[in-house]
Design a protein with these regions (language model features):
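Helix-rich interaction surfaces within compact, conserved domain-sized segments
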Residues: 114-171, 176-182
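Short acidic/polar inter-strand loop motif in beta-rich domains
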Residues: 88-96, 156-163
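Bacterial Sec-dependent N-terminal signal peptides
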Residues: 13-38
Length: 182
């Protein structure tokens, strides 16, 4: 009888000592899967002069190298309206990651750098704090020559920053395109 009495007294203590005080974990915002980056450059002075640069890596981190293409040369002495589209073509239908990058503009930034040929870049889209995003930009080739253009999308960079070297974060996609300016 005593055992039953102690057992009945223990039940409320056990019940109230087991509370559900676990806070729900914050969702992890993982890096985007990007298989394709398409850069479209439209000449401000001649709308029919369109240069398309694309990198496509349909097997993701698989063994095949990405296919990198540039449709033609850039023209010196002019400027181009640039736009970038990011896709995940491992999904069917392909998922447009550009929308997610633009919605999470405070967590992304596109960086541009040229080597061997002079180019200026001007950001045309910004996050809510006025920091650059880079899916819309202006590119101005400064003179004729050949070189490379590297475009890098960084996830969760430090903003503001002084460029890719101080941005931190992790790289969602980075590609170097061979370019010619005539």
């Amino acid at each position: 009888m005593k055992l039953l009495k102690y057992a009945l007294l223990a039940i409320p203590f056990l019940y109230f000592s087991c509370s559900d005080d676990d806070d729900a974990p914050e969702p992890i915002n993982e890096e985007e899967v990007i298989t394709t980056m398409t850069v479209t450059l439209v000449n401000h002075q001649n709308g029919s002069d369109v240069v398309t640069m694309q990198t496509q890596d349909l097997d993701g981190d698989g063994p095949n190298e990405p296919v990198v293409t540039v449709s033609g040369p850039l023209s010196a002495g002019t400027s181009y309206a640039g736009s970038i589209q990011f896709l995940n073509e491992m999904e069917d239908p392909a998922e447009d990651i550009t929308e997610e990058v633009q919605e999470e503009d405070d967590e992304h930034q596109v960086f541009f750098s040229a080597s061997g040929v002079g180019m200026e870049f001007v950001y045309m889209d910004f996050d809510g704090d006025g920091n650059p995003l880079g899916t819309q930009f202006v590119l101005a080739p400064l003179g004729a020559g050949s070189g490379s253009l590297t475009i890098t999308l960084v996830h969760e960079p430090t903003k503001p920053n002084d460029g890719l070297d101080t941005a931190g974060g992790s790289i969602d996609i980075q590609t170097t395109f061979s370019v010619t300016v005539e």
